[in-house]
Amino acid sequence: ESTRPGAEPVPEDIELQRIIPILSEIRAKWQDIIISVDTRKSRVADAAINLGANIINDISALRFDPEMADVLSAHPQVKVILMHMQGEPQNMQVNPHYDDLFGEINAFFEERITYAEKKGISYDHIYLDPGIGFGKTAEHNFQLLAHLEEFHRHQLPLVVGVSRKRFIAYLDNSSVEERWGGTLAAGLVAALKGVDILRVHNVQAHHQFFQVLKAINEVSEWKS
């Protein structure tokens, strides 16, 4: 199910038809990798978990489907990503507004964490995602990236996705295919701010980028 701004919901049966074959194939081929599945639907989450998914990424933070929390609590080995989003994908980019950006998102996280724990989900199985590009203006997104440390107060792993998102084009009107420079810059900032998981499209490019940074940082001086 696409979560792009303006995207229409996908019926549950269609989502299952899309996920089950590829998830089955991936898990059969690679038994040890960690698999995260994006879904707001409890039935899809349950099927994915039974096929070996390790993480459920719910962009609604357990609000869309009242049975999602029950499915997750029934599988205590599975972790969940709770993402902040103002509105729904169909309308989230229609004049998003905050009186207190960080205060409102942190209050949302506190409420969702409390709800998850009451439903039997372990605190240390929760990841938080401030939702870059989900119900935020470009300015909001830049503010979030500049101050991601504001979310460390929850003492939970942080997840951020910035890859090719529209806020990058705010600066130069670039197309989706032209946003790799901005993607890497935003990803670097997120890493420096202590983000634990960076969601990306081009794994190889990001791996190379961070490997080079690591190599440079490990060298005390350059010799010709």
Model-derived regions: residue spans:
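Active-site metal-binding loops of divalent metal-dependent hydrolases
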Residues: 132
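Short acidic capping loops at alpha-helix termini that bridge into adjacent secondary structure
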Residues: 32-33, 122-125
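Active-site-adjacent loop and "lid" segments of alpha/beta metabolic enzymes
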Residues: 3-28, 33-34, 39-43, 49-50, ...
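Conserved C-terminal portion of the radical SAM core fold
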Residues: 117-119
